[in-house]
Structure formats: structure tokens, C-alpha cells
Amino acid sequence: MRTQYCGQVTAAHLDQIVTLCGWVHRRRDHGGVIFIDLRDREGLVQVVCDPDRAEMFKTAESVRNEFVLKMTGKVRRRPAGTENANLTSGEIEVLCHEIEVLNTSATPPFQLDDENLSETVRLTNRVIDLRRPQMQKNLMLRYKVAMAFRRFLDGAGFIDVETPMLTKSTPEGARDYLVPSRVHPGQFFALPQSPQLFKQLLMVAGFDRYYQITKCFRDEDLRADRQPEFTQVDIETSFLNETEITALMEEMIRFVFKESLGVDLPSPFPRMTYAEAMRRYGSDKPDLRVTLELTEVTDLMKDVAFKVFSGPANSGGRVAAMRVPGGATLTRGEIDEYTKFVGIYGAKGLAYIKVNDASQPNETGLQSPIVKNLSEAALRGVIERTGAQSGDLIFFGADKAKVVNDAIGALRIKLGHEKGYVTGDAWRPLWVVDFPMFEYDEDDKRWTACHHPFTSPKDEHVELLKTNPGECLAKAYDLALNGWEIGGGSVRIHRADVQATVFEALNIGAEEQQVKFGFLLDALKFGAPPHGGLAFGLDRVVTMMAGAESIRDVIAFPKTQRAQCLLTNAPGEVDEKQLRELHIRLRQKVETQVEVGKA
């Protein structure tokens, strides 16, 4: 039906007859000559319809935007001065000989080049939205990235094995999506939050190197970088230690970026412990492009009169300072806006000191309402530790450690990018290692797994599982890139006794272990090899590469932040017959919620 894609016609085809198929992107009538920009997934080409061919010209007069056309014509150079350097086909145009309307189109709900559309409008009309050149580029990039992952893993001896989509509900952190069983009344499958247990079982079965690009499902509150269903590049390997696994995965990520974007990432990626990342950046996925850092000053504030600082300092909280070079020029209005911003993260305020004269750490050299309530020794310590100079500003966070880390860590990113405290590097990868095994849930008064309960503790910390779980570090590693976690994994527990001990630390008793994880514990008894792995979020990786604002811009048919599909109106009601077959009865009629406003 066609000889070329529209976007692939170039000067190499001069004087050739080509047949093209595509959509009318734009039609223009200039002095009796009609110009049609014909579009397909590869791009645009300008087609010229001359009135000398009467029948063809009459058809051209009738076409409108988004009509589907088949056009045959001769490739020629554009007149001098009319070239378009933004198009691959910008040096040439096609003089139309024949035109056939393959299909007409209703008036589209919006122009494809309209950049002020709400996300609700875009997602409701997703099919039209996907015709926009940027969306076409995003999904083509997604394909290239996925294929690059596959090429590397295939070449490294990994095999692609599918794992079940209907699985058993197990506690992995987020809520499961449950699927009722028709043939087993009152029982439910769960859609997998990850293939975690199955890929471990494949290692026990001796497959050595596994990968899968697969869908995962988590019924959790959504953010800009989250979806209820997301795509994961899932990887597991046997007989490699933590260092060997991260080295192999680092090689893979460099390969994927080079193949997909032509970008050379640094080698090797730097490594940083979780404790250092939280201390210096307030985040376990720090954006290293931002040069601002947090400085620990908790010990300096224990004896000061300022209760906002001394309170947290003496009750297990944190007081952190962040030096902003040249920041004394910030206006009161700007500081007020930053104060409102940190409030989003639970901070009760944002203390600051303007450093007018760093040589005088007192009310003479420092400007702030809090200076009079801080000792000169504390102020001198702050100036020395932060390295503050005259003309700088120092922000403070004082609260529970989590609030300080979240609030000042977020302020660091916002201020850094807004005011130019950045390195200028395009990509700054970082391995974050030595995560805690557990964190304490104050509400439930119990330990929970920081990653998941199948992560191996460091060899020297196995004994701490029973005596002091809070001090136990894990053989876990995350790959952060520009402030995003793009991948995470760990060495797994391969001994049944250690796995049972971890379950006990999580308050999962022997009976519950057998009910929920008996199949895993049994498998580990039959010569399970040392194994570990990692999973990369394909949606996040592509979002970063594409420079998109949301992962919804790199997924063909995404859900909204209320976990709805505006195109198909899913989820939806089902009829009583289907419910009866599933042995389900609704306790009360549920009001149908209609998505409005922000998507």
C-alpha cells in the first residue's frame, strides 16, 4: 500500500515516485496550491497538490485534519528558503499525482499541537492524544529501552521466564489487588506486587539467570511516579555476591543509556551508605546534581535556650542545618514561601540565619530572630561545620528525624534547582547500600521490613535478628539517578532457618509462616543456592530519558491518580449474575464516582 514512511522520505529519494499513507496533520491553501502535512509514526512530510491535476485537486480540497490518506507523487527539492530544518524530510516535498481518502475523521476534540490541555482531557481522549508527535516519540523510546534491556540480558546468559499473574496474597507492603475465585468460593487470588518469590524459586530450581519484563500491581495511593499497574524489568541470578550483582547491573544500565539515548554514563557509579545519604541529603535517593547538603548539628543544640532546637535534640530527634551560599540575598517573601513548602512535609516552621559577618558568630554578625536564643558556642559550631561564609544563609530543620529529612531534603531539591545550586551534569547515578533490615512501626508496635522479608542480613548481623533487629543491616542496594530510585534489589536469604528467624523478627509466627510462605521455606530446604537480584522500574527509566513530567506520559493507557481509566471508564460495575457466580454480594449499593478535575 505504501513505499515509505512519511517521516523517512529524504533528499535520497529525489525524483523518485513514492506512495505514502498517513493522517492529515495540517492542510493549507496558498494561492490555489494546497499543502498537506501528512503524518505517520515516523514524522511529517509536505505534500503539494497542484490544480493542474483537477480530480486529485478536488479531493485535496475536501480533506480535513486527521483524514486518513494514501498519496502518490514525485519527490522534489523544496524551493530555496522554504526548507524546514526541524523535519527529517525538511529539504524535500512530494508533488502529488494521486490521492485516495482511506477514511474521514470527525472534528478532533483538540489540536494535536495544543500544549495547554488538561490531563483529564488528554486521558479521556487518549487515542487522539497518542497521535501527538511527543507521545509517539515517548512510546518509541520506551520500545527502544525495553529492547536494549533484553539485548543485554540475553547476551549475559539470562533467560526470559514468565511467572504467574494469579498468585497467593502475601504481605509485601502495599495492598494487593484481589481476584475472587469462582470455583473456590470465598477464596481469592492476588495480582502480583512483584515476581519476587517465583524468581527465587526459579533460582532454587537451578535456572541460574532469569529475567522478565512484566506487569506488577499495587493497590496504593498514587503519585506522579506511581501507577496501580506498572512495568518492571525483573532480574535474579545465582552464585553472585552483592558487589558482582551491582557491577553487572551497572554495566547493563550504561548499555541501555548508550543504546537508547547515545549517552555515556560515568564509570564506575559512586556508592554511598544509606546512613550517609540520609545524613547529607535527607533522602535515600539523593539528587547529586544539587550541590546543597545537610549538616548534622543535633549535638550542638542540646543545651541551647531555644526549645524548638533543644527539644528534638534531647528526645531522639534531629537538628540539621543547610548552608545556602550567597543566600543572604533571599527576600522575606521567598523565605515565607519556602516555609510554606516545608510545611507540606510536616515541618512546623523553617528557622534561618543570615550570615552578614562569619567572623562574628553572634547578634552582631548574624541576622535572625533565633540568634539571641542560641549560645555563641552553638553558633560558632554551626558556622564551622557548615563552612558558612559572609553573605550566606543557613536554613534549619528540627523535629523527628523523618520530618527533618523529608522537609529539608525536599527544600534542598527545590531551592537547588530554582536558584541554580546544581553541577550542570545531566546524569548523576548513585548506588545506595547498607540499608537497615527493619524499621519500627510506632502504630502497630512491631518491626516491619524496609525492603521485603526475603532480603538477607549482612553476615555479621545475623545474630542481631534475635537480639537487636533495629541495628541489623541488609545486603540491599538501590540505584538512584537524579533523585529518582530507578532500581532496587538485594541478596536474598537462601537458608530456611535464617528466613524463619526474619519472619519471627517481623512477628510472623511459625503457623502463619507455613500458611503464607510454606512453599518458600520448603524449597529453601532443598539446596537453595546463594542468589540475589534487582528490579528496574521501566516506566520511571523511560520517564527520565524522555524528560516527561509524569510516568503517565510514557504509558500508552495509564490510570489517573484516582486509579481510573478515563478512556474506558474502568473500574466499572458488573451485573448481579457475575457477582453470584463469584459468590459475592455487595452489602450496600455503592455510589458511582465520576472523575472530575485533576487526573
Swiss-Prot record:
UniProt-listed GO biological process terms: aspartyl-tRNA aminoacylation
**Where does the entry annotate site (Important for tRNA non-discrimination)?**
30, 81
The UniProt annotation puts the region (Aspartate) at 196-199
- Grouped into one coarse class, the protein's main location is cytoplasm
Q: Which CDD domains is this protein grouped with?
A: AspRS_core (cd00777), EcAspRS_like_N (cd04317)
> Per the record, what is one GO cellular component?
cytoplasm
Q: Does the keyword Membrane apply?
A: no
- Give GO MF terms, alphabetically: aspartate-tRNA ligase activity; aspartate-tRNA(Asn) ligase activity; ATP binding; nucleic acid binding
Q: Any idea where this protein resides?
A: Cytoplasm
Q: What is its EC number?
A: 6.1.1.23
Asked if the Swiss-Prot or TrEMBL record annotates the protein with the keyword Magnesium, the reply is no
Task: Tell me which domain of life the UniProt entry assigns to the organism this sequence originates from.
Answer: Bacteria
Q: Which InterPro entries match?
A: Aa-tRNA-synt_II, aa-tRNA-synth_II, aa-tRNA-synth_II/BPL/LPL, Asp-tRNA-ligase_1, Asp-tRNA-ligase_1_N, Asp/Asn-tRNA-synth_IIb, AspRS_core, GAD-like_sf
What UniProt keywords apply to this chain's record, in alphabetical order? Aminoacyl-tRNA synthetase, ATP-binding, Cytoplasm, Ligase, Nucleotide-binding, Protein biosynthesis
Task: Quickly give the catalysed reaction.
Answer: tRNA(Asx) + L-aspartate + ATP = L-aspartyl-tRNA(Asx) + AMP + diphosphate
| Quaternary structure and interacting proteins, as annotated | Homodimer.
- What is the protein's known function? Aspartyl-tRNA synthetase with relaxed tRNA specificity since it is able to aspartylate not only its cognate tRNA(Asp) but also tRNA(Asn). Reaction proceeds in two steps: L-aspartate is first activated by ATP to form Asp-AMP and then transferred to the acceptor end of tRNA(Asp/Asn).
Which protein is depicted?
Aspartate--tRNA(Asp/Asn) ligase
Report the source organism.
Answer: Azoarcus sp. (strain BH72)
State the encoding gene.
Answer: aspS
